[in-house]
């Protein structure tokens, strides 16, 4: 285990970073760019912080942290990202919120666990491009849906045909978006196939009933090919399908519920995967039918999502494709 003398917590936003050394109650606010990183290096020098013996802890932000991570890798600084929910749940009762306070709490979280921390793997450029392509594909799909709604509403309200100028323009936009989406999907598959391990894992998880290409792409991207989360449960917390207790003493007796702090796009795509699994997987269908007798459908759907995550991580770990061998008891 490498001896780290300093653990820094970093709260990253789109334009700024807040860095804190909780043990010494030192903090820095800087821009999330090269100039800000230079300011960070000077701050470390002024406070005798040896970056070669420094460990940086930060949260997943969906991409805002990548520029800072690239800086860390260029300077050979060890770092690790954690789901925001995991850090939040470790804090206990917290009053108030600011970027500076968040950086302090992240640093505390790292200091408490420093003996068990392992650095993250270096960023994979193919994974970064994959995430960028998926984000742009999502934008194109949403735009397409908007244009489709425009056509539908205009035809309904004004009883016009395809020769109407607005409908014709919207149709052209839809056709262009379809072409661009196809190009992006082709590039996504090209990226995945260019990496033998990535392509094999993609084939493994899409062999599961319910996990189609889009869920496969997103899972590969956001787990960074199953390297950025230690196990299925940590990923499930990140996605937001793990329910947490909501009770205290005799006055608060809430049911377990999932947190609003989640990667909502992944969760949304898994919703569709869970519905398909219930329809087409005999095992999942039997589970849903059994539980529907006394459980709410939303709870069952959430449980199926967790089962799919467990199945993906288990199969990837074993390096095996899914084989349907369920036999319903007579």
Which stretches of residues belong to each language-model region?
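Phosphate-backbone recognition surface of nucleic-acid-processing proteins
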Residues: 207, 213, 219-299
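Stable alpha-helical structural segments in soluble proteins, enriched in small hydrophobic residues
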Residues: 99-110, 269, 273, 308, ...
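Nucleic-acid-processing active sites and adjacent nucleic-acid-binding tracks
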Residues: 24-50, 55
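Gly/Thr-rich phosphate-binding beta-strand-loop-beta motif of the actin/hexokinase/Hsp70
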Residues: 2-22, 106
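Long, charge-rich intrinsically disordered scaffolds of nucleic-acid metabolism proteins
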Residues: 79, 84-204
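Low-complexity, acidic/Ser/Thr- and charged residue-rich accessory regions of DNA metabolism proteins
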Residues: 288-330
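Short glycine-rich phosphate-binding loop at a beta-alpha junction
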Residues: 52-64
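Short helix-capping/linker segments at secondary-structure and domain boundaries
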Residues: 113-118, 224-228, 276-283, 311-324
